[in-house]
Amino acid sequence: MKTLAYDLHLHSCLSPCGDNDMTPANIAGMAKIIGLDLIALTDHNSCKNCPAVAIAARKYGLLFLPGMELTTAEEVHVLCYFASLDAAMDFDRYVSDHLPDTPNKPMFFGDQLIYNEQDQISCTEQRLLISATDLPFDAIYDLVNQYDGIMVPAHINK
């Protein structure tokens, strides 16, 4: 039996809690340096950096699981993992329609950077990603299943 070292709850520079140094290449490179075999990107309410992290992970010989840390209407954080990048990006588009139009304030929450496949900044997310969606917790399991994914509560204290 092969054992894997993994981190299934990583944020990039897209998440308001992330640092601008948490670029796709840096995430994958550091994961390789510390001996991880598998990483999952779970930015807050977005999968927009998953394509770039998937490419960076492949370059470093890492397995990659696309994901998202979804904030429900009740402000519960749920980790959502997907079998494919396409499914994750489809889910991202769905969730985007359920986020409030609260603008990000970079001075307080950071820049929310989106990277392209060449590990360069392509744009910034203008809406604040740590806001709660209007999606109720009770609907998330079935919703994530529709996108060939699984969900796991992110924190034991909420």
Task: Please annotate each region the language model reported.
Residues T3, A56-K158:
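Extended substrate/RNA-proximal surfaces in nucleic-acid metabolism proteins
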Residues M1-E75:
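An N-terminally biased module of ancient metal coordination in phosphate/nucleic-acid-related enzymes
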